[in-house]
Amino acid sequence: MATVPTRSGSPRQLTTKQTGDAWEAQARRWLEGKGLRFIAANVNERGGEIDLIMREGLTTVFVEVRYRRSALYGGAAASVTRSKQHKLLQTARLWLARHNGSFDTVDCRFDVVAFTGNEVEWIKDAFNDHS
């Protein structure tokens, strides 16, 4: 677990959710700095969650944010398994349908923003609905 300093100066432990939220906020700011526009965060649809939905031009970008302290076992990007990709695709499909769209009618892609230690890696079009 990560720690953050408090007003008293002594560090406190962050929960897994707080750590994830902090990295998602960092990814959002980083992507906005690259010119993407924020649409939504923590979108839940039938058991799946999309960390961030952004827009780059006319493209809707579904973003999975990952953090790992080190590159052991492949680092953050390697943790987006085929099973996780399938869940993200299903969640995006449901979100698009809720917003009167589909993969056939909306230009979209799936990106991964991976933080490994102090490094950030942006994998554009990391996978797609044809994977």
From Swiss-Prot:
It holds the Pfam family UPF0102. Residues 1-21 are annotated as: Disordered. InterPro entries: Restrct_endonuc-II-like, tRNA_endonuc-like_dom_sf, UPF0102_YraN-like. One of its GO terms (molecular function) is nucleic acid binding. Coiled coil: none annotated. Belongs to the UPF0102 family. PANTHER family: UPF0102 PROTEIN YRAN. This is UPF0102 protein YraN.
